Amino acid sequence: SDTLQYIKFFFREGTAENGGFQNFSLIFETNIRNAILNECSAEFSNMYLMLLDYLADYMYFDLKTERISNENFSRTVEKFNQTRRTAIKPKSFLISCVNANILTEATDDFAVEFHDKNTYAYFVAKALNRQFEKDPTELAKLKFVMQHICFGINDTIILFLSFIRSNTRIITAIQVAAQDLLQEFQEWDFKERNIPFLQYAQKTSAGVPSKKDRKETKLHTERVEEERHNTIKFRGIFDYDEGDVQKEKYVILRALKYTQLIGRGLVDQYGNLDANEVDSLVSSLYSLPQKIVYAILKPQQEHVDDIVQSLLQFAKESMPEEHITEEKIRHLLADAGTALALNILNDIAFNATNKSTIHALESYSPHNNNAKILRLMMQENTGDTA
């Protein structure tokens, strides 16, 4: 339909320009409400939406499942009826939600599930929001989502939650969490050479990216993000080992996820944030990525000689005709480390920058050369490198 085409266009163009999540969230929420209204009367629609929150909360936090049996589904509806003094019929509720493409019946095992993982994440976020409104001090479920942000749909839940509440406290809480995770790490600073093996990187000359280059880079980023979501579609959102949560690599990845969310939050909440909050977030966006780079590369630095010798031995045994030298391997390691570092910086620049936020981002006084590079990346993401 024309409406669907418009929504697709608005999502594609709006998010590319905005750099955040707000446009998608607004359309998503509107579509959910309209879909329910098309299937039942207005008096039932609000009850159905609250029951969907209740169902998502129970499935996600209590059952930790993507599917709920038909029997358990009916019991959950009846429990909602008892606690809320409502009289919703499980079958009527299910039919309406299936027709609205919110729930799906899995006929192969007589179960019910949310239509897709974004819909599931949205209603979990709505349930969390409702809990905050009742008791702002009850944070156990939010802490679970934050701690598991590297896994499943938890990052999407946080994004929806920050939009639903339009509350800057969520973004500032994420900022504090990121700072706590990275407090023991210093910032990567190539002038100070605190990751010495990167000094072997081979120098290359490159010009300022053209408009075509920036467009191709943006399209590539969108394709990567789409592939990531498609991968999640076919992988269970609870398919992870709880023991992995506190492993150092996931702690650093969690800090990276938090920093990405700070950038998106700056974009989505810009205008709602006080000046001192903006300044604090901007300062973190310049500092935290450098700490993440340091945290990732420091273990490699500590064992770089062993890594070089191991690779050198491998090269001699596997490809003696190439005559690969130790110097060549050090160059390759440095090039790879530098590329990783710059990709992390550019990822944060991409998430934090649009035509509104660039004013605050440019106003920050860079405290080292790394920060100057990050600022250039932010300018490039708005097409302003003049």
Each predicted region: which residue ranges?
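Generic helix N-cap/helix-start motif at coil->alpha-helix transitions
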Residues: 118, 138, 149-156, 185-186, ...
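Hydrophobic repeat-domain scaffold segments
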Residues: 130-315
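Charge-dense, extended regions
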Residues: 276-386
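Surface-exposed polar/charged interaction patches
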Residues: 13, 34, 38, 58, ...
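Extended hydrophobic
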Residues: 1-131, 144-152
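Helix N-terminus capping/helix-initiation residues
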Residues: 69, 89, 165-167, 274, ...
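Intrinsic-disorder-associated interaction segments
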Residues: 17, 21, 25, 44, ...
